[in-house]
């Protein structure tokens, strides 16, 4: 049986980002991104969405999964910046 690595869930990531926003550890890229504001985060999300599309067209499934994970990360950072909860988004699914 193949052993898998520990998996971080969507909820785990959101909790981790919230903790970083609250504790503001020195040198945290998440804190720097939050401090950069919604405009910068929006630009990053557009960049990552483009990379997802390109990976879907031209890359392996593994590379695509990596790009999607980055898009999810930056989307959650934006959610944190705006004060949205996971439930705010889940209600729209």
From Swiss-Prot:
Keywords: Amino-acid biosynthesis, ATP-binding, Cytoplasm, Histidine biosynthesis, Hydrolase, Nucleotide-binding
Cell compartment(s), UniProt: Cytoplasm
Enzyme class, UniProt record, top EC level: hydrolase
A Pfam family per the record: PRA-PH
Annotated GO CC locations: cytoplasm
Pathway stated in the Swiss-Prot or TrEMBL entry: Amino-acid biosynthesis; L-histidine biosynthesis; L-histidine from 5-phospho-alpha-D-ribose 1-diphosphate: step 2/9
UniProt-listed GO biological process terms: L-histidine biosynthetic process
GO-annotated molecular function: ATP binding; phosphoribosyl-ATP diphosphatase activity
The keyword Ribosomal protein belongs to this UniProt entry's keyword annotation: no
Disulfide bonds: none
EC annotation from Swiss-Prot or TrEMBL: 3.6.1.31
Swiss-Prot/TrEMBL catalytic activity: 1-(5-phospho-beta-D-ribosyl)-ATP + H2O = 1-(5-phospho-beta-D-ribosyl)-5'-AMP + diphosphate + H(+)
Protein family (similarity comment): Belongs to the PRA-PH family.
Name of the protein in its database record: Phosphoribosyl-ATP pyrophosphatase
UniProt gene name: hisE
């Amino acid at each position: 049986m193949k052993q898998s690595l520990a998996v971080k869930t969507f909820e785990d990531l959101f909790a981790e980002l919230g903790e970083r926003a609250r504790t503001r550890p020195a040198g945290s890229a998440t804190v720097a991104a939050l401090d950069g504001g919604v405009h910068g985060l929006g630009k990053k999300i557009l960049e990552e969405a483009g990379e997802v599309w390109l990976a879907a067209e031209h890359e392996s499934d593994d590379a695509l999964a990596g790009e999607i994970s980055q898009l999810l990360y930056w989307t959650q950072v934006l959610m944190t910046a705006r004060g949205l909860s996971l439930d705010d988004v889940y209600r729209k699914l």
